[in-house]
């Protein structure tokens, strides 16, 4: 598995409230995480970093990682619920952090399958051959309006409340988590990203960049550059996982 990560403050914001991590384990298992924080002062930065750090710690502390998709989803849910409580309790104990929260999207790769869990509007995309699909469903007010047929997807792109979330990590004591698992084959690519990328780079451009012959790190660099070229009003984060077709001699799979 080839991996790459890039997070950037963007051209307008003073602080980067996004965070991300790629954690490797035994048997080439990989956990990738993207979090997009929110809250007053620097609280969003606190929430996203807490989420990524805690997921990484739980990954490193795990004696065994399940391989069955249903068990992988269960493991992700348990860890994210624990992180939710940790962020919520921290916010309640620190006045300057009250109301903080974060999105989270995680992908757990276990060889031939990937399990994805998410809260909020940070996304996971899958590229298989020429099929480029959004794996996650945004937990946002605008997406709910689209889902119920009140507005079109085209209207959603320019809706004034586009960034209003219907749920986030750490804002409530209890939260529901969406999960999904699927098979992955050599050549497939998985993109995890914050809305600072998807609000500025069209799906066709995302697909074209992922399909290019560039190295994974060059691809995520280009994705972030594109978002900045198109305004860069928000923090931008992209994590790329590529299941290599073959291992080139001397090439680093990590």
UniProtKB/Swiss-Prot annotation:
Essential cofactor(s): Mn(2+)
Residue span(s) of domain PPM-type phosphatase: 2-243
Record NCBIfam families: Stp1_PP2C_phos (NF033484)
Molecular function terms, GO-annotated: metal ion binding; protein serine/threonine phosphatase activity
Metal-binding listed as a keyword: yes
InterPro entries in alphabetical order: PP2C (IPR015655), PPM-type-like_dom_sf (IPR036457), PPM-type_phosphatase-like_dom (IPR001932)
Protein residues bound to Mn(2+) 2: 36, 195, 234
Keyword Hydrolase tagged: yes
Species the sequence originates in: Bacillus subtilis (strain 168)
Record's function text: Protein phosphatase that dephosphorylates PrkC and EF-G (elongation factor G, fusA). prpC and prkC are cotranscribed, which suggests that they form a functional couple in vivo, PrpC's primary role being possibly to counter the action of PrkC. May be involved in sporulation and biofilm formation. Does not seem to be involved in stress response. Dephosphorylates phosphorylated CgsA, EF-Tu and YezB.
GO biological process per UniProt: signal transduction; sporulation resulting in formation of a cellular spore
Positions of Mn(2+) 1 binding: 36-37
Lineage: Bacteria, Bacillati, Bacillota, Bacilli, Bacillales
Keyword annotations of the record: Hydrolase, Manganese, Metal-binding, Protein phosphatase, Sporulation
Cofactor note: Binds 2 manganese ions per subunit.
Annotated Gene3D superfamilies: PPM-type phosphatase domain
Gene responsible for this protein: prpC
Top-level taxon: Bacteria
Protein name as catalogued: Protein phosphatase PrpC
Record field: catalytic activity: O-phospho-L-seryl-[protein] + H2O = L-seryl-[protein] + phosphate; O-phospho-L-threonyl-[protein] + H2O = L-threonyl-[protein] + phosphate
UniProt-listed Enzyme Commission number(s): 3.1.3.16
